[in-house]
């Protein structure tokens, strides 16, 4: 309810004052399975507090908030970015309560950059055009359940594919900047 959101936002702002006094800042991280998951949750915090945000593309998308829309709504509040792609078809059973988040991860819900439904290239390009100069963190969720993967297998493969994709985005963006 509104009273609970007002209280949560007031606490976030109070925490922000405390950390700012020590030369730090905080960033709220929207995440599947938490209090701040769906667009209405995110907007409740955006409207009621001044807290910074971890722009987690994958978790925003899985919660139903288009990352491009979030960027338009909260660009000036982004503290850092989690680069994360998601396949919404594999997230659907998790959202319906038919699978746990861990089962969704095991099934490949969070995939290498460019293999999912997040408009990664569009979002990164817009962040760069808008002058974002903070951290980008490549976040690749993996669920290793049967011991250590063989060399050249496991999450390393997905991370390398994501890096390759991000390099391609960077090359396109850089070429576009030089042409302008």
Protein language model features and the residues they cover:
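Active-site acidic/histidine proton-transfer and metal-coordination neighborhood
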Residues: 1-54, 156-157
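A non-catalytic, amphipathic alpha-helix used as a structural packing/dimerization or gating element
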Residues: 7-14, 73, 122, 157, ...
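Conserved, mostly hydrophobic/aromatic
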Residues: 8, 26, 56, 81-83, ...
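A structural motif corresponding to the C-terminal end of an alpha-helix
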Residues: 14-25, 121-133, 168-176
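Short, well-ordered coil/turn segments that N-cap beta-strands
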Residues: 20-25, 48-51, 77-79, 130-135, ...
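Active-site beta-loop-alpha junctions enriched in small/polar residues
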Residues: 31-33, 58-60, 84-86, 110, ...
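Gly/Pro-rich active-site loop or hairpin
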Residues: 61-133, 147-157
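C-terminal helical cap(s) of enzyme catalytic domains, especially alpha/beta-barrels
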Residues: 148-178
């Amino acid at each position: 309810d509104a009273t609970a959101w007002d209280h949560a936002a007031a606490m976030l702002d109070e925490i922000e004052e405390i950390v700012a006094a020590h030369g730090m800042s905080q960033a709220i991280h929207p995440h599947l399975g938490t209090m701040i998951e769906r667009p209405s949750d995110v907007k409740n915090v955006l409207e009621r507090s001044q807290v910074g945000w971890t722009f987690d593309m994958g978790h925003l998308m899985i919660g139903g908030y288009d990352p491009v829309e979030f960027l338009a709504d909260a660009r000036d509040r982004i503290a850092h970015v989690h680069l994360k792609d998601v396949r919404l078809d594999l997230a659907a059973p998790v959202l319906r309560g038919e699978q746990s988040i861990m089962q969704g991860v095991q099934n490949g819900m969070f995939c290498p950059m460019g293999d999912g439904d997040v408009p990664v290239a569009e979002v990164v390009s817009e962040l760069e055009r808008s002058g974002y100069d903070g951290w980008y963190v490549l976040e690749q969720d993996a669920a290793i359940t049967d011991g250590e993967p063989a060399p050249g297998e496991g999450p390393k493969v997905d991370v390398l594919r994501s890096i390759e994709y991000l390099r391609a985005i960077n090359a396109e963006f850089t070429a576009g900047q030089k042409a302008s």
